[in-house]
Amino acid sequence: MEKTLKISKIRDGTVIDHISAGKALEVLNILGSNNGSISIGIRVNSKKMGLKDVLKIENVFLEKEDLDRIALIAPEATISIVKNYEIIEKFNVDMPEKIYGIVKCSNQNCITNANEPVKTEFIVDSRSPVTLRCLYCNRSMSGDEIIKNLI
């Protein structure tokens, strides 16, 4: 007999689905603390991915900057907006061509790390795996280096 544990539905909020297995806590960490109740499914069976992670965040609706951050860690993620227990909108995160102000350059000598009023700007060189290149110093970053430098 197969036993299944399901994450309960949320009344209003955001569901982040199709996160690569083991990445849910990283996604949650970059979203920061909020007042929403959070349900986490880690290494859940998925027909599409084999194993995946899922986040359900009650009473929280994400901004574009949050979606850009998620795209850096989980570019295959699907976002569902839930109102009154119904999905009213569903879409995949979209990796922008350029990333502004949400990642710090790992090059300590970059102008963006000096005491200058310069906002960071990165070009997305690759979507899989995600690779960013600083517009100012051409330093490339990928994987954990991006996660470590998220602002």
Swiss-Prot record:
Return the cofactor note field: Binds 1 zinc ion per subunit.
One GO BP: pyrimidine nucleotide biosynthetic process
Q: Does the keyword Amino-acid biosynthesis apply?
A: no
User: What Gene Ontology molecular function terms does this protein carry?
Assistant: metal ion binding
Pfam families given in the database record: PyrI (PF01948), PyrI_C (PF02748)
Q: Which cofactor does it need?
A: Zn(2+)
Q: Which residues bind Zn(2+)?
A: C105, C110, C134, C137
Keyword Transferase in the entry? The reply is no
Listed under subunit, the entry gives: Contains catalytic and regulatory chains.
Q: What this chain does, per the record? A: Involved in allosteric regulation of aspartate carbamoyltransferase.
The family note in this entry says: Belongs to the PyrI family.
Stored NCBIfam families: ATCase_reg
- Put simply, this protein is called Aspartate carbamoyltransferase regulatory chain
Native organism:
Picrophilus torridus (strain ATCC 700027 / DSM 9790 / JCM 10055 / NBRC 100828 / KAW 2/3)
